[in-house]
């Protein structure tokens, strides 16, 4: 039976079945191939899409805009300072108004409850471009990238380790995605940075049906052994105060992905992924502030790892992730 997701919200992966998630990944792969060959057919001509960004963005905004334009849709970007949302107008009222003007709405912002409310009252499909709790569109891109870089394998045959802050929206979403798709995921982090226990329990229940393997560990060598992919994210998420940096850097330093971690996988074909942005040098404002405050010892190790001539970046069109292949 054909899969139809017409008029469905996409707020979190927990709302979707494994078959529906696989359908979206396959669709993205086919659209990407069609664009590359010059045969993409526009199916959204005459449609209008609102992009609400209460948090700033580079890749997510560009991905939504380019994808919409490629499919023939028009977009309206509503930035952090360009609307009355949350100031003079509630999200419920905003949803009702925009739902009458637009055919779909993307939201990137704060609490998951906000995008859920938007989805409840808009009357048109709403897509989650990131909340504090989840980042489902990023996970679709990540799973697609994994398949592209593991030819001949299916998602249940793949394993990956996520190192760092596993309680953030990426840790949460990767765990959900892996559970849904029957994958082997290892969340490698200090115990205080593991995902919420209720979500872990929910994912383990899903895994009991899909065959997924979920491991939470503080031991880096145990967590990364024989994985196909290593994944990490920034240690300090958007909106977190600078006062949190010192403790975070101290706690996360052992979970930095560097050459030692690559070697510990014992997999010569392991690949590295980062959802970006990444602070790996002093070439950004935040990077300079961190280096001035906490030094560059660990970064220098990372620079040598990233600059090795046998490593190369391969940005994947419409995925938002960067694999590094040895």
From Swiss-Prot:
Reaction(s) catalysed (UniProt annotation): carbamoyl phosphate + L-ornithine = L-citrulline + phosphate + H(+)
Domain of life: Bacteria
InterPro entries linked: Asp/Orn_carbamoyltranf_P-bd, Asp/Orn_carbamoylTrfase, Asp/Orn_carbamoylTrfase_sf, Asp_carbamoyltransf_Asp/Orn-bd, Orn/put_carbamltrans, OTCase_ArgI
Pathway as given in its UniProt record: Amino-acid biosynthesis; L-arginine biosynthesis; L-arginine from L-ornithine and carbamoyl phosphate: step 1/3
GO biological process: arginine biosynthetic process via ornithine; citrulline biosynthetic process; L-arginine biosynthetic process
Annotated compartments: Cytoplasm
GO MF terms held by the record: amino acid binding; ornithine carbamoyltransferase activity
EC id: 2.1.3.3
Pfam (any one): OTCace_N
Binding site for carbamoyl phosphate: 57-60, 84, 108, 135-138, 275-276
Gene Ontology CC terms, in alphabetical order: cytoplasm
Keywords linked to the UniProt accession: Amino-acid biosynthesis, Arginine biosynthesis, Cytoplasm, Transferase
Positions of L-ornithine binding: 169, 233, 237-238
Family: Belongs to the aspartate/ornithine carbamoyltransferase superfamily. OTCase family.
PANTHER family given in the database record: ORNITHINE CARBAMOYLTRANSFERASE, ORNITHINE CARBAMOYLTRANSFERASE, MITOCHONDRIAL
Protein purpose: Reversibly catalyzes the transfer of the carbamoyl group from carbamoyl phosphate (CP) to the N(epsilon) atom of ornithine (ORN) to produce L-citrulline.
NCBIfam families tied to this protein: orni_carb_tr
Record protein name field: Ornithine carbamoyltransferase
Gene that this polypeptide is encoded by: argI
């Amino acid at each position: 039976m054909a899969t139809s997701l017409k008029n469905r919200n996409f707020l979190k992966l927990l709302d979707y079945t494994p078959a529906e998630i696989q359908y979206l990944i396959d669709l993205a792969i086919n659209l990407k191939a069609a664009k590359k060959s010059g045969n993409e057919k526009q199916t959204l001509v005459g449609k209008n899409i609102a992009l609400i960004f209460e948090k700033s963005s580079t890749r997510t905004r560009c991905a939504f805009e380019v994808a919409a334009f490629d499919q023939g849709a028009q977009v309206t970007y509503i930035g952090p300072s360009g609307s009355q949302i949350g100031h003079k107008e509630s999200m419920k009222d905003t949803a009702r108004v925009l739902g009458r003007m637009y055919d779909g709405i993307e939201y990137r912002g704060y609490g998951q409850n906000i995008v859920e409310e938007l989805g409840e009252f808009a009357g048109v499909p709403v897509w989650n471009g990131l909340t504090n709790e989840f980042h489902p569109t990023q996970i679709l891109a990540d799973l697609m990238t994994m398949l592209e870089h593991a030819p001949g394998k299916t998602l249940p045959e793949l394993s990956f380790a996520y190192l760092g802050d596993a309680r953030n929206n990426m840790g949460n979403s990767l765990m959900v995605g892996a559970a849904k798709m029957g994958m082997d995921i290892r969340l490698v982090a200090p115990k205080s940075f593991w995902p919420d226990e209720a979500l872990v329990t929910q994912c383990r229940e899903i895994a009991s049906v899909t065959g997924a393997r979920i491991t939470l560990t503080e031991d880096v060598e145990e967590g990364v052994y024989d994985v196909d992919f290593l994944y990490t994210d920034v240690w300090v998420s958007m909106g977190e105060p600078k006062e949190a940096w010192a403790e975070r850097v101290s706690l996360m330093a052992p979970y930095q992905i560097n050459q030692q971690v690559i070697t510990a996988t014992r997999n010569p074909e392991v690949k590295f992924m980062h959802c970006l942005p990444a602070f790996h040098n002093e070439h950004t404002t935040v990077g300079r502030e961190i280096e001035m405050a906490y030094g560059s010892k660990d970064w220098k190790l990372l620079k040598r790892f990233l600059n090795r001539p046998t490593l190369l970046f391969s940005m994947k069109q419409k995925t938002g992730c960067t694999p590094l292949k040895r």
